[in-house]
Amino acid sequence: MLNNGSDGLVDQHTRFLMRFDNDFKVDGYPPPNIEDGLEIKGGEFVTDSIRTGYKYTNTSNSYGMINTSSTLSPDLFGDGDPFTIDFWYKPLAVIDACSVGHEWYNGIFYFGIAGNAGDLGLFFATQRGANGSKVSDAIIGRWYHIAMVRVDYTLYGFVDGKRSVSFPCSNISLRYSNIDFNRQRDGSNRASFVIDNFRISDVARWTSDFDPPK
């Protein structure tokens, strides 16, 4: 039976869903193996008028990691297989930093705040940053729905359901590297944001504009 609660986020293609409702709730179909596969440190649950999420800050012990090789099935997430990662994201400061990334340095995708000096904003990148673009201003305290979709050798990036970028990317398995929250390649966990409803799906859910899930 699909454990989709009231938000409908779990369907037959949801393989990992991490909710932050004043507790860590991990769902999926079937339920994912999270033993030794999930590490969350140094943050806190926060609630605003819209939703409850998990807050990371620019301190050295505030980060998270999903061990993809233990939580995702090799039968569904092999080389070249499509996937979708989507989540809700609220910046708390405009700081040049990666918020969600496929572990440096050969990862498939990176999302956070970056750009030219004095012009930082929401930013997608692939191939160690060789392909990257600011796609929106980062408004402090505003919730954004973020989605990254891999189809063959292309990564599509979406903000609030609007397709913002399409970049060449690696077709390696998503299981090749871990997924990091607020862990920077230089060891400085300096981002400051809130995240909620982090979902990994085994299909390309969207390749054009869509209405974000709640």
Predicted feature descriptions by range:
Residues 16-20, 85-91, 146-148, 181, ...:
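Short hydrophobic/aromatic patches on beta-strands that form ligand-binding or substrate-lining surfaces
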Residues 167-194:
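Flexible glycan-contacting loops in extracellular carbohydrate-active proteins
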Residues 12-15, 24-29, 62-121, 155, ...:
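Extracellular glycan-recognition modules
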Residues 65-73, 128-134, 182-184:
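Short structured motifs
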Residues 78-80, 138-141, 172-174, 190:
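Surface-exposed coil/turn segments at beta-strand junctions on protein surfaces, enriched
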Residues 29, 36-63, 86-94, 109-171:
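Extracellular glycan-interaction surfaces
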Residues 1-63, 210-214:
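Extracytoplasmic low-complexity segments
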Residues 8-9, 137, 189-192:
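A general structural signal for stabilizing positions within well-ordered secondary structure
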